[in-house]
């Protein structure tokens, strides 16, 4: 059982009756409400709340075997609901080594033993399969142990990533937990000009709003521009909300989507378990955000002002107009039409229309892989696939391949590549000494023919369009709502569902400021210890934060509360970044925001976290102009009143109040995970 050291533990269960007053909800909150379990009667979920969820489906891919190993290590024998779990093999499908084939066989055998739906190598990329086969479906909440689960939002399904421990929990118990993120409303206005596509939209959004405006947010796309986007374009945009920093990218269910599903009915064998007359007919009963729903931010972009864009090189936050790059005569070595982002039928046909009656330029390698075997079959039937092959494109099996840096055709030292994929991080698609750009399928195909980054119009011999000035805006309501939350905190002392035995009603400690943004997991727990499994707890405590500040250990003590800047815990998935803080007898970290994987690893290991941007801003203002210190004892104390869902900051332990603010509710289901020492302990208790 988890012990809060140096804390008094409340043994009484505090319970609150929820008000019957309607709380306006956005679409994200409404979907989560459907899939949240164990809520107190009358509880309406809101952004910031920690909730237990029972997702409609959970997908794992090549990482299914590590999840299975963790699942077995928990003592689980049988999957709780084998209709909830889906397994696909898609990442390393070109790898025919004995080791990889053995792993694939183990996954298939496990799926067979458990009666789990399994899709072998060659069937397609897992996210595409999830959409095609209806595991991701409008108004569902579907998770996957992969960062591009956001893609499901393109069909009105709330898709979000989880880590392997979460997946093992879903297998064993049918559920895991989620903190409902702040929700950003992104309004798409107008209609895209000819020659501009969904990929250009998300490249523009990533490039224009590139200061973490939507980091760890849920996104809801709205506006009259949505109806002009095809479903394939919506899937592309939702897919790359991951690179934009968001945890979901949700489009509305509208007539365009309903007609798309009507067509899907004719393509799938009927009766189909998930996409059938009944489920499609039910989409006419629209679920919409309340008109007075709250959003953390409102962003707007006018689609009519966009032109073709590229991301890069080597960053999705750097964007340039095609007009500018085309004029620079940037030679390319490789081009890629692959991945779950842009390898659907419309993408392949668009590329084929550009490349028909032409050849891939000498010295250029053009790789193509369909997002699924279904897509490839349709592309072959339409003639688009053969058009690409006749032009000199090199086919790859349906799967992730070069997008994830696996298999044939990777970028080599000094090469330049242009790709219709979602990530161009340095070294991701091959050599760290290569340059990678992201673009739409049309621009990728044109560049493959031209041998340089260029327009389709250059292939056609038509005039090249110029760049436009993009019209966009952002309004941030965080500061206003923070003040409103503070006022509400004064008047609403008990919004929580209660406190379990063994969980403290209050957590208090002195704030120790680590004043930096983007403190990564290597700064928290040095990489040289990550794969040493025998590091004792005392040593973990000693090296905690040493890469960030070697003096951290001498300046901090048990019971302190770390307070830091934005995107705390970014970087790798190492769980020790959370457990080393616990080893120092610190049970709470407050930050402006957290890296998503760190947040999940924290709760999964019983470390509590709170996002309070207003506190960070107050502390930074307090020390403005003073000599910088990596680690600073502030003399301010924070008290988290768990049943009241408020944090009060005072100058001194019993001094004047500096800040009082509402925070997300930590429901009893989540408290139980903490009391059990983390998610694995909780799962074991359920078996």
Curated annotation (Swiss-Prot):
**Which PANTHER family does its entry note?**
HOMOACONITASE, MITOCHONDRIAL, HOMOACONITASE, MITOCHONDRIAL-RELATED
Q: Which key words are in the record?
A: Amino-acid biosynthesis, Iron, Iron-sulfur, Lyase, Lysine biosynthesis, Metal-binding, Mitochondrion, Transit peptide
* One of the record's GO cellular component terms: mitochondrial matrix
The identity of this protein, by name, is: Homoaconitase, mitochondrial
Q: Which Pfam families match?
A: Aconitase, Aconitase_C
Q: Which reaction does it catalyse?
A: (2R,3S)-homoisocitrate = cis-homoaconitate + H2O
Gene expressing this chain: LYS4
Checking InterPro entries in the record gives:
Acnase/IPM_dHydase_lsu_aba_1/3, Acoase/IPM_deHydtase_lsu_aba, Aconitase/3IPM_dehydase_swvl, Aconitase_4Fe-4S_BS, Aconitase_4Fe-4S_dom, AconitaseA/IPMdHydase_ssu_swvl, Homoaconitase_mito, Homoaconitase_swivel
Presequence range in chain numbering: 1-18
Cofactor(s), names only, from the UniProt record: [4Fe-4S] cluster
In the record, what terms sit under GO molecular function? 4 iron, 4 sulfur cluster binding; homoaconitate hydratase activity; metal ion binding
Indicate yes or no for the key word Iron-sulfur.
yes
Group of enzyme by EC:
lyase
Q: Which organism is it from?
A: Yarrowia lipolytica (strain CLIB 122 / E 150) (Yeast)
């Amino acid at each position: 059982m988890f012990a809060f050291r140096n804390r008094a533990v409340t043994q009484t269960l505090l319970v609150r009756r929820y008000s019957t007053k309607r709380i306006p909800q956005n679409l994200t909150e409404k979907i989560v409400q459907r899939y949240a379990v164990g809520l107190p009667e009358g509880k309406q979920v809101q952004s910031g709340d920690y909730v237990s969820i029972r997702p409609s489906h959970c997908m794992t891919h090549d990482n299914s075997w590590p999840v299975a190993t963790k699942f077995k290590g928990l003592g689980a024998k049988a999957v709780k609901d084998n209709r909830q779990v889906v397994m696909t093999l898609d990442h390393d499908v070109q790898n025919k080594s004995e080791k990889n084939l053995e792993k694939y066989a183990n996954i298939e055998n496990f799926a067979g033993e458990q009666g789990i739906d399994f899709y072998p190598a060659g069937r397609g990329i897992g996210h595409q399969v999830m959409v095609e086969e209806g595991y991701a479906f409008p108004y569902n909440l579907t998770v996957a142990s992969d960062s591009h689960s956001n893609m499901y939002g393109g069909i009105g399904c709330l898709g979000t990533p989880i880590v392997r421990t979460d997946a093992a929990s879903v297998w064993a118990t049918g559920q895991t937990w989620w903190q409902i993120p702040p929700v950003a409303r992104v309004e798409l206005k107008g209609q895209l000009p000819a020659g501009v596509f969904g990929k250009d939209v998300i490249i523009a959004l990533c490039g224009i709003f590139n200061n973490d405006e939507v980091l760890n947010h849920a996104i809801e796309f709205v506006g009259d521009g949505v109806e002009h986007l095809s479903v394939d374009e919506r899937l592309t945009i939702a897919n790359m909300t991951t690179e934009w920093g968001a945890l979901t990218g949700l489009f509305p269910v509208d007539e365009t989507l309903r007609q798309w599903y009507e067509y899907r009915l004719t393509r799938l064998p009927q009766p189909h378990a998930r996409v059938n007359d009944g489920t499609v007919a039910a989409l006419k009963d629209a679920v919409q955000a309340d008109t007075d729903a709250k959003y953390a931010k409102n962003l707007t972009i006018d689609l009519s002002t966009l032109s073709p864009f590229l991301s890069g090189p080597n960053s999705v936050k750097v964007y340039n107009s095609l007009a500018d790059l085309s004029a620079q005569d940037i030679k390319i070595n490789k081009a890629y039409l692959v991945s779950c982002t842009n390898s659907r039928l419309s993408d392949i046909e668009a590329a084929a229309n550009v490349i028909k009656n032409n050849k891939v330029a000498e010295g250029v390698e053009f790789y193509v892989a369909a997002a699924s075997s279904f897509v490839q079959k349709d592309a072959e039937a339409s003639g688009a696939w053969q058009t690409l092959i006749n032009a000199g494109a090199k086919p790859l099996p349906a799967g992730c391949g070069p997008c994830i840096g696996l298999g044939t055709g990777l970028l080599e030292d000094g090469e330049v590549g242009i790709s219709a994929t979602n990530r161009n991080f340095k070294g991701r698609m091959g050599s760290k000494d290569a340059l990678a750009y992201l673009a739409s399928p049309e621009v990728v195909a044109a560049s493959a023919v031209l041998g340089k980054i260029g327009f389709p119009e250059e292939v056609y011999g038509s005039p090249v369009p110029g760049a436009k000035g993009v019209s966009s805006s952002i309004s941030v309501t965080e500061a206003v709502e923070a003040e409103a939350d503070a006022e509400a905190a004064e008047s609403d002392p008990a919004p929580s569902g209660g406190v379990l035995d063994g969980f403290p009603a209050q957590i208090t400690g002195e704030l120790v400021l680590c004043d930096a943004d983007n403190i990564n997991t290597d700064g928290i727990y040095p990489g040289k210890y990550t794969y040493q499994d025998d590091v004792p707890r005392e040593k973990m405590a000693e090296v905690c934060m040493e890469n960030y500040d070697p003096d951290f250990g001498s300046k901090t003590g048990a019971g302190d509360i770390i307070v830091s800047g934005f995107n705390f815990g970014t970087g790798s998935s190492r769980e020790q970044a959370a457990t080393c803080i616990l080893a120092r007898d610190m049970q709470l970290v407050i930050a402006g925001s957290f890296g998503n994987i760190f947040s999940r690893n924290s709760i999964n290991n019983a470390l509590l976290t709170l996002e309070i941007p207003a506190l960070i801003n107050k502390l930074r203002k307090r020390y403005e102009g003073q000599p910088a210190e990596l680690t600073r004892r502030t003399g301010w104390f924070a008290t988290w009143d768990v049943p009241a869902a408020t944090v009060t900051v005072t100058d001194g332990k019993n001094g004047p109040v500096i800040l009082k603010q509402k925070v997300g509710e930590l429901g009893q289901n989540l408290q139980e995970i903490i009391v059990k020492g983390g998610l694995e302990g909780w799962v074991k208790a359920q078996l």
